[in-house]
Amino acid sequence: MSRYRGPRFKKIRRLGALPGLTNKKPRAGNDLRNQLRSGKKSQYRIRLEEKQKLRFHYGLTERQLLKYVRIAGKAKGSTGQVLLQLLEMRLDNILFRLGMASTIPAARQLVNHRHILVNGRIVDIPSYRCKPRDIITGKDEQKSRALIQKSLDSSPQEELPSHLTLHPFQYKGLVNQIIDSKWVGLKINELLVVEYYSRQT
């Protein structure tokens, strides 16, 4: 299954706010209307919708998300927590959380077009897994800096997660540590996602 490229508002109307996909928010009352229209949800549908929220927020294909679930399942600790850590430490998501890109698709474009350096080297793989002490910078070119500046100017002035530090005038971000679960950028029940995949195998 390919990455979703359809109408974004349609997805947030059904699944709720997906800040990584779009900075638009569903209108108040939409959730209630959807529940009334669809009646009582089955457990399968609840798990499916949590999985879809995760997939669309982080901009993943079905195959990519399944791969992350399998990696998380083999790691020490809670599979759900490890899964969220893996997704949050992707380069495209780090750029989004720093405010250097307005959405995760926009961050992916920055990376694909070689505007981003990690530790002084161009990285053009959006799924690159960032590590503590990584230094992320915009390329020292006018176009790269202009794209990042536009996002910095328009990004909401929210508290930065504790695992990141931003130096906006240097177009630079630092990864201080692995993300703490309380700073995950999406309201999600990750256990339902793990359950969804465990029942598919």
Swiss-Prot record:
Subcellular location, in the record's words? Plastid, Chloroplast
Q: What protein name does the entry list?
A: Small ribosomal subunit protein uS4c
- Family recorded in the similarity comment: Belongs to the universal ribosomal protein uS4 family.
- The gene behind this protein is rps4
Q: Which domain of life is it from?
A: Eukaryota
Q: Which residues cross the membrane?
A: none
> Which CDD domains does the protein's record reference?
S4
Q: Which organism is it from?
A: Coffea arabica (Arabian coffee)
Q: Does the keyword rRNA-binding apply?
A: yes
GO MF annotation terms: rRNA binding; structural constituent of ribosome
What job does this protein perform? One of the primary rRNA binding proteins, it binds directly to 16S rRNA where it nucleates assembly of the body of the 30S subunit.
Q: Which SUPFAM superfamilies match?
A: Alpha-L RNA-binding motif
Please cite one Gene Ontology biological process associated with this protein.
Answer: translation
| Lineage of the species this protein comes from | Eukaryota, Viridiplantae, Streptophyta, Embryophyta, Tracheophyta
Q: Which GO terms describe its cellular component?
A: chloroplast; small ribosomal subunit
